[in-house]
Design a protein with these regions (language model features):
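Feature for exported/extracytoplasmic and membrane-associated proteins, marking the mature portion
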Residues: 1-238, 273-277, 285-347
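Metal-dependent active-site segment of extracytoplasmic phospho-/sulfohydrolases and closely related
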Residues: 232, 236-263
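Histidine-centered active-site microenvironments of extracellular/periplasmic hydrolases
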Residues: 255-285
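Active-site proximal loops enriched in glycine and acidic residues that flank catalytic Cys/His/Asp
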Residues: 204-207, 250-252, 262, 278
Length: 347
């Protein structure tokens, strides 16, 4: 299984030429790093230089930077390249109210904000609650991709109801933080452990665009990175042995400026960090080339430069973990999708 998560910024104001340190609020990642399940890819991002959130996110989720005409998402194309004649309706799951750009395409995907409501909610008679839940979702959806997966979604409703999502206790004392992100990952863990045939899942965490009073040690960024790392760590603990066959990748549309602005915040930047976590991951290591933070090394004199294309990281996960060998169709025009260019963060 592969989990794709959309996040935003990770940065350390104490990073120097010779060393880099993480934020104190990311301490939940320390055991995963020590166990060599967690790896870092620094200075990763898109080669496109847009500073627009909308355009940058669209490029990252379509997997075609600089091309606005792409209709489907990279993760959907990846699944399309894997023949699964008896695929589960839960093959591709997104936690949220709509199918994200990443999963848009010909392969059916299911979006849900809450698996309990998805399974038992509805507007009609109690005896037909699941059917009514699906009908309500179908009528309210404005996403043509979701409309095209009606039969699959209806089957998913029936399967999920039989899994009894109301009764779930995270394993091994996994403690998910309060908030939508932690709740999303808890529900993904439920789906995976219910053996419903999940192959890929998507969750996101927003609220990172801090141009004012950012607070990397105490404040907005500290709070978000704490929630981010604690939720992922809890998810990993909750999966137990299933984590050995799981790869989690975090990504964002861009990073932030290398220096603080006049309002104690940071502005839209270029390179960012990607975290990869899982049983197959060769963790406890940092991958990629560090470009440096000296004035002459910054992109356009203000941002961390991109030295690893985000598609390199994703290509390796898709090829070596999911078994997709036709990466040219997943990332058209991207030359470094060839296995010879992999970072080799997977064992």
């Amino acid at each position: 299984m592969m989990i794709a998560e959309r996040t935003c910024r990770f940065a350390s104001e104490s990073a120097t030429e010779s060393s880099a340190s993480s934020l104190p609020s990311l301490t939940a990642f320390k055991p995963l790093w020590d166990q060599k399940h967690l790896a870092i890819v620094h200075a990763a991002g898109s080669p496109d230089n847009t500073r627009s959130h909308f355009d940058a996110q669209d490029y990252m989720e379509s997997g075609t930077p600089g091309v606005k005409s792409t209709e489907d998402g990279w993760l959907n194309r990846a699944l399309a390249g894997l023949k699964e004649p008896d695929a589960s309706p839960f093959r591709a799951v997104a936690m949220g109210g709509a199918v994200p750009r990443t999963l848009a395409g010909t392969v059916p995907a299911v979006a849900m904000s809450d698996i309990r409501g998805f399974a038992v909610g509805g507007r009609g008679p109690a005896g037909n609650a699941a059917s009514n839940s699906f009908e309500a979702m179908y009528e309210q959806s404005v996403d043509s991709v979701l409309h095209g997966t009606g039969n699959e979604t209806f089957e998913a409703v029936k399967m999920l109801k039989s899994a009894d999502p109301e009764k779930y206790t995270p394993a091994a004392g996994a403690d998910y933080p309060r908030g939508r992100f932690g709740d999303s990952l808890r529900q993904v863990a439920q789906l995976v452990k219910a053996n419903l045939g999940v192959e890929v899942a998507f969750a996101d965490i927003g609220g990172w665009d801090h141009h004012v009073n950012e607070g990397s040690v105490q404040g907005q960024i500290a709070n978000l990175t704490k929630e981010f790392s604690q939720a992922i760590a809890a998810f990993w603990i909750d999966l137990g042995d299933l984590g050995e066959d799981t790869v989690i990748v975090t990504m964002s549309e861009f990073g932030r400026t290398a220096r603080e602005n006049g309002n104690r915040g940071t502005d839209h930047g270029h390179a960012n960090v990607m975290f990869v976590l899982g049983g197959p991951v060769k963790g406890g290591r940092v991958y990629g080339r560090w470009p440096g933070l000296q004035p002459g090394q910054l992109y356009e004199g203000r941002d961390l430069a991109v030295t690893t294309d985000f598609r390199q990281v994703l290509s390796e996960a898709l090829n070596r973990h999911l078994g997709n060998s036709n990466l040219a169709k997943v990332f058209p025009g991207f030359e470094k999708s060839d296995p010879r260019n992999f970072l080799r963060y997977l064992g």
